[in-house]
Amino acid sequence: MEDLKIVVPGDHIGEGFVAGHGTFVAPDTQQIYASIAGVVHMQDRVICVKPIRSYYRPDVGDVIVGRIVSVDHGRWLVDVNSYQHAVLNLTAINLPGGVQRRRDEEDKLHMREFFQEGDLISGEIQQVGTFDGKIMIQTRNQKYGLLKNGVLLKVDSNKIRRMKNHMMEFFSEPSIGLIIGTNGYVWIEALSKGKNTEPITEKERIQIAVLRNAIVILD
C-alpha cells in the first residue's frame, strides 16, 4: 500500500498523467500542480487531489457501512457519510432464509422487521446517478446485512484505499472481525456472535476496544 502524499496549492505532484480535479497544468512545462490542499490520488493514468476533509464520493462496487435513517414507500434511506443519503430498495435486500421471490405489499408493511431506524448495516454501492448523484445500495450478498455486537468508528474516507477485500478477520482469542467501509465508517465486531442478539463477553469487548483504539491512533 503506497504512502499518502498530502499537498497544498502550488505543490508539484507529477507529469505525464491526465490532470484530474484539484490540479492544474503549467502551460509552459506541462507539469501538474495541486490547486487545493488534500491527498494525491492516482487511478489508471489520472492524477487528482482529494480534499483532506470532504464527503465520501461513492463508486459502484464500494463496500460501505451505513445507518438507517428512515423507512418508507418500499425503501430505506441510509446515512453513508456522503453528500446525500443512499437509497436501499426493498428489492435490493435478501429476504429471511434467502427466499427468492417477488416483494409484495405485505413485505412493505413489515419493512421494519428487516431494518429499522438506527440500525447499522453493511452493503455495496449498486448505482450512482449520472446527473442527480443519487446513491443506490444493495445488501443481496450473504456477507452484507444487519450489524450487531460491535462498535462503529468514523475515519476520514480519503485515507481509505479501495481494496479487493474490505472485510477482515483477526484470529485472536476471541476472533474479531473488521469491515472497512470505503465511506469512512469502520465496523468492529465479535465474530463468535455473528449477527445474532446474544450479548458479547467481557473478553470480546476488550478485544474490540483494543482494535478500536489502534485505529483511532493511526487516524
Region roles according to the model:
Residues M1-D219:
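Single-stranded RNA-binding regions, centering on S1/OB-family and related RNA-binding modules
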